[in-house]
Amino acid sequence: MIALVPAAGSGSRFGAPSPKQYLQLNGKPLMWHTLATVAAVPDVDEVAVVISPQDEWFDDFAWDLPKLSVHRVGGASRAQSVASGLAALACADDDWVLVHDAARCCLSVAAVERLIAALSGHAVGGLLALPVPDTVKRADIDGHVAATVPRNGLWLAQTPQMFRAGLLARALSSAAAEDITDEASAVERLGVKPLLVEGDAQNFKITYPRDLALARAILAARDEY
């Protein structure tokens, strides 16, 4: 099984001088924590990180992680980076691929193992996700409440998202002209249904500077590394 971590983004919303995956978090680059967790999963044979060909930061750090391979084939979008990473890896169609956000650095090994166990023998694949816990409002153009959306059946998608390499490559190719934000969206467009596997609230994506304090606290409380 291959874990693919797209990390070619610039992190423009973060407003930092370097992409957020390289910001220091408890003494190491943020992405180090992500890669270390995925590498610690026994079923994962390779951790392939996809970075931009113009990346100026990756080589500044000593990653010192097992199973790690680096591919400078990242594209302008997440979907392009994942598709290019798959092509660079030359996976067999039946190989399972776990795609995980570089910025979800508080992922646990247990959550990945839960996903793998749930998808053993599954025809399509699936993803970690959380049921929506709060009341959901739809806003109008002026920021007023237009409607309250029933939350029954609504889930918040997380990563990893796990699919067979052949299916994922076809899905990404088919959706190349679309603005998709995760692999499951591309797979759904083929008319198949990924499985939702309950994730973990700690597996959030670092998006804004305020997220770093929570990530520091979570990682400091762990003895994994």
Curated annotation (Swiss-Prot):
Gene name per UniProt: ispD
Site note Transition state stabilizer, residues: 13, 20
Xref: CDD domains: CDP-ME_synthetase
Top EC class for this record: transferase
Family: Belongs to the IspD/TarI cytidylyltransferase family. IspD subfamily.
GO MF assignments: 2-C-methyl-D-erythritol 4-phosphate cytidylyltransferase activity
Site positions (Positions MEP for the nucleophilic attack): 151, 205
Descriptive protein name: 2-C-methyl-D-erythritol 4-phosphate cytidylyltransferase
Keywords, comma-separated and alphabetical: Isoprene biosynthesis, Nucleotidyltransferase, Transferase
Record-listed E.C. numbers: 2.7.7.60
Biological process terms in GO annotation: isopentenyl diphosphate biosynthetic process, methylerythritol 4-phosphate pathway
Pathway(s): Isoprenoid biosynthesis; isopentenyl diphosphate biosynthesis via DXP pathway; isopentenyl diphosphate from 1-deoxy-D-xylulose 5-phosphate: step 2/6
Reaction(s) catalysed by this chain's protein: 2-C-methyl-D-erythritol 4-phosphate + CTP + H(+) = 4-CDP-2-C-methyl-D-erythritol + diphosphate
Function as written in the Swiss-Prot or TrEMBL entry: Catalyzes the formation of 4-diphosphocytidyl-2-C-methyl-D-erythritol from CTP and 2-C-methyl-D-erythritol 4-phosphate (MEP).
Sequence intervals crossing the membrane: none
